[in-house]
Amino acid sequence: MSFVAHPNIDPRSLGKVGVLLGGRSAEREISLMSGNGVLAALQSRGVDAHGFDPGLQGVAELAAAGFDRVFIALHGRYGEDGTIQGLLEQLGVPYTGSGVLASALAMDKQATKRLWMTHGLATPRFAMLHADTDFDAVVADLGLPLIVKPAREGSSIGLTKVTAADQMRAAFDKAAALDNDVIAETFVDGAELTCPVVGEGDTAEALPVIRIVAPEANYDYQNKYFTDDTQYLCPSGLDAEVERQVQALAVQAYRVLGCRGWARADVMLRADGTPFLLEMNTSPGMTGHSLVPMAARAVGISYEDFVLQVLAAATLDLHPNEHWKPE
């Protein structure tokens, strides 16, 4: 395991650190929770860490802050879609998590699924929806139930489980209010799983799988963050070989997208034992209900030590010497 229980990291070597939190996406509330947790964890380890909210503070302020590296605790648009990553590349400030391209790909569910399919990785069949789409034809092709959701949102925001064809229009309208691109995918009936991955390229490896048991099998925004009724099982209770298969699939999905640092793959395990990839989260939640810290704890890594190691791995797509400097 590249991440360890007691990392030998000198907090002074990390310099002045910015924790980006809040932002302007529909997931702002969750990002504030994640970011404040990360900020407190880093400060408890002696890191010179400071919160920075791009939803309230501008680019000039970020450039003037003098951060030596940044922990991205933003979720959703402008935070994990390549936007802030591109800005930090321009500023030459190393940041946590995936680079510009991998972040943009993973945020776009259509692009992610097409890439996974090209590499032979199992993911539910899907169709893109538009206002003039023949919804009956989509239902006839994909079957019911369907999951209809914005193509570029997270935390189950704007998501609807459609069980009858006459529900399609309302489901589309709900998702389209958040994104111009709406996706419908076949519903996979089975166990809901998630698997964090850390590292990069050939060194990427999976943390333990978590099985999610939500009230009435409805793991929505409310049940993800604001209820204690959802059960998170880690160890997952899966057969050891099935767990290894899910972990291997998560690592493959991570590598295909070009992710680095850390991410979390969401997976459905069909009753016949076949795992299906749903999406990849390149800036996972770090709240009290979040799953990555839970998986880390299962292998003896505390929240604080995990955060410290994510930060220590901050980097850039380009080597600092490759960044343009005015003559």
Swiss-Prot record:
<keyword id="KW-0133">Cell shape</keyword>
<comment type="similarity">
    <text>Belongs to the D-alanine--D-alanine ligase family.</text>
</comment>
<feature type="binding site">
    <location>
        <position position="281"/>
    </location>
    <ligand>
        <name>Mg(2+) 2</name>
    </ligand>
</feature>
<dbReference type="GO" id="GO:0071555">
    <property type="term" value="P:cell wall organization"/>
</dbReference>
<feature type="domain" description="ATP-grasp">
    <location>
        <begin position="113"/>
        <end position="312"/>
    </location>
</feature>
<keyword id="KW-0573">Peptidoglycan synthesis</keyword>
<dbReference type="GO" id="GO:0009252">
    <property type="term" value="P:peptidoglycan biosynthetic process"/>
</dbReference>
<dbReference type="InterPro" id="IPR016185">
    <property type="entry name" value="PreATP-grasp_dom_sf"/>
</dbReference>
<dbReference type="InterPro" id="IPR011127">
    <property type="entry name" value="Dala_Dala_lig_N"/>
</dbReference>
<keyword id="KW-0067">ATP-binding</keyword>
<dbReference type="GO" id="GO:0005829">
    <property type="term" value="C:cytosol"/>
</dbReference>
<feature type="binding site">
    <location>
        <position position="266"/>
    </location>
    <ligand>
        <name>Mg(2+) 1</name>
    </ligand>
</feature>
<dbReference type="GO" id="GO:0046872">
    <property type="term" value="F:metal ion binding"/>
</dbReference>
<dbReference type="GO" id="GO:0008360">
    <property type="term" value="P:regulation of cell shape"/>
</dbReference>
<comment type="function">
    <text>Cell wall formation.</text>
</comment>
<keyword id="KW-0963">Cytoplasm</keyword>
<keyword id="KW-0479">Metal-binding</keyword>
<dbReference type="InterPro" id="IPR011761">
    <property type="entry name" value="ATP-grasp"/>
</dbReference>
<keyword id="KW-0961">Cell wall biogenesis/degradation</keyword>
<dbReference type="GO" id="GO:0008716">
    <property type="term" value="F:D-alanine-D-alanine ligase activity"/>
</dbReference>
<dbReference type="Pfam" id="PF01820">
    <property type="entry name" value="Dala_Dala_lig_N"/>
</dbReference>
<dbReference type="Pfam" id="PF07478">
    <property type="entry name" value="Dala_Dala_lig_C"/>
</dbReference>
<feature type="binding site">
    <location>
        <begin position="139"/>
        <end position="194"/>
    </location>
    <ligand>
        <name>ATP</name>
    </ligand>
</feature>
<dbReference type="GO" id="GO:0005524">
    <property type="term" value="F:ATP binding"/>
</dbReference>
<dbReference type="InterPro" id="IPR011095">
    <property type="entry name" value="Dala_Dala_lig_C"/>
</dbReference>
<feature type="binding site">
    <location>
        <position position="279"/>
    </location>
    <ligand>
        <name>Mg(2+) 1</name>
    </ligand>
</feature>
<keyword id="KW-0460">Magnesium</keyword>
<comment type="pathway">
    <text>Cell wall biogenesis; peptidoglycan biosynthesis.</text>
</comment>
<keyword id="KW-0464">Manganese</keyword>
<keyword id="KW-0547">Nucleotide-binding</keyword>
<dbReference type="InterPro" id="IPR005905">
    <property type="entry name" value="D_ala_D_ala"/>
</dbReference>
<dbReference type="InterPro" id="IPR013815">
    <property type="entry name" value="ATP_grasp_subdomain_1"/>
</dbReference>
<keyword id="KW-0436">Ligase</keyword>
<dbReference type="InterPro" id="IPR000291">
    <property type="entry name" value="D-Ala_lig_Van_CS"/>
</dbReference>
<feature type="binding site">
    <location>
        <position position="279"/>
    </location>
    <ligand>
        <name>Mg(2+) 2</name>
    </ligand>
</feature>
<protein>
    <recommendedName>
        <fullName>D-alanine--D-alanine ligase</fullName>
        <ecNumber>6.3.2.4</ecNumber>
    </recommendedName>
</protein>
